[in-house]
Amino acid sequence: MKAGFAQIDFTPLEGFMPGEGLPFWARGEARCPLLASAAAFAGEESVILVSVDALSLFTDRADDLRARISEKTGVPVSHILLAATHTHTGASGYEENSGAPGEPLVAKYTDDCIVNAAVQAFENMKDGFSLGTGKGIEDRMSFNRDCVLDDGRIVSIPGKAAKDHIVGYLGTVDHDVHVMRVDGADSAPACFIVNYANHPDNDNTKRTHFSSDYPGYLRENLQMIYGKDVVVLFLNGACGDVNAFNYKSGVSERYASSNTYMPEEMGKLLTETVCKINREITATDNAPAVKAATRTDTYQLRVPAAWEVEKALATKAQLDAGERIVNSTRRVMESTLSYDPTAPATMEMEMVGMRLGDWTILTVPGELYTEIGLAMKAVAPEKKILVSEQTNGRVGYIPPDKTLGTTAYGGRYYAGMLGLGTKDKMVGAAKALMEELG
C-alpha cells in the first residue's frame, strides 16, 4: 500500500498551559515534548491523520487547519482528521482556554507545524507498506470519575476522602486498546496508531513544564523499542467521564504514588499492553481499504438547570456586594447568566467516518462520555470501530441525557454545548456513516 509519515516538535520554550482552570506557566525543557505526528494513506481515496499534543483545537481553528492542509495536498477536507490528544500540559491556543490566556504567536507556530507535518507525510508517501491491526484490554488505570455518594449527590473527581461514601458510578469505562502497525518495505515498523480512552491530566503538583502526558511517554517508549524514526499517532477514545484515579479504593495505585511521575508510569503500562497486542499483529499488503465520509447533523443546545441559575445569581449577588470571587467561579457565573432563551436552540456538528484497513474511525469534536462512545461502537459490533474524541473541533463535554443538569462536571451548562438527545443523534450518525463506508 501507499503511505507516508512525519512528525514535528512544536514545544514552546515557555508559555501557559490550559486545562486546569488556572494559568499554569511552563518554563525550561519539556518533560515530554509536544509533537504533531502525521500519517497519510492512499488507496481508492487519500486520507491524512494528524495527532496533536494539545488540550483541544477549537472548531474554527481546526476548520482553518484542515482547509490549509487540503489546499496544499489536494486531499478533501472531509478526509483529514486532526486529533488532539487532550494533554492538560500542552501549549495555549489563540484565545483564553480553561483559565489560561491565549498566546497567538505560540498558536500560530503550532498551527504551522501541524500543517507542515501533514504536508510532509503526504509528500513522503510511497508504495511498499503493509498494514495490520490488533486489539487488547488495558484495565489497570482507567476508572469512571462521576461518583454517586451515599447521600445521593453526584460528584466528579471526589478525592480519596470520599472512598467510604461512594456507592456507585454514573457511567462506565471502555478498556479497549486498538493498535495499527504499518511496516515498511524492509518489514520494520514505520508507524503505530494507538486508540485508548483515558484523560491525560496526570501532572498533579509537577505542572511546571510542558508535557505530552502518558501518550507522549507511550510514543517515546515505542520509539526506543522499535526505532527512533517510528511515527506514533495517539487517538484518544471516549474518556469524558474517565481518569486514572480509583476514588473508591482510597489508595494511590503504583503508577500514582508520590515517588513516581504519573504520566511516565502510565506510559509504561500502556506500552506493555501495546507491545503485547503488537506481537499478535501480522501486517499484509493486500490493498487495504482507504476512504472517508462525513455528515453534519443538527443537535439541541444545552440549557442551564434551575439550580445552576440559582447558584449563578447568588454568586453575582456576592460579587455585587464587593466580595472576592475566584476566577473559575466567576467564569461559571458569567457562562450560566449568558444563556439567552430567545437565541437559536440548535447547532450543526460534523462527524467523520474513516475506513483504514479493517478499522473504521468515527470522530467526535469534544470530550465524549463513555456510554455514548460504546453505543457508537455497538452499531456494527462485528466490525472494528474506534471512536476518536477531541477530533476536528471542540464542543466541550458530550454526556448522555441522564448526566445533563446534574452536578456531574460534564453535565453542567458551562461544560459543553450539546443538550438533550445527543446520544441518539450521534448513534444515528455513526450508523449512517458505517452504512455509507460499507
Regions found by a protein language model. Give the residues of each.
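Conserved beta-alpha junction segments in alpha/beta enzyme cores
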Residues: 1-265, 278, 285-438
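Anionic-ligand-binding alpha/beta catalytic cores of soluble enzymes and soluble regulatory domains
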Residues: 270
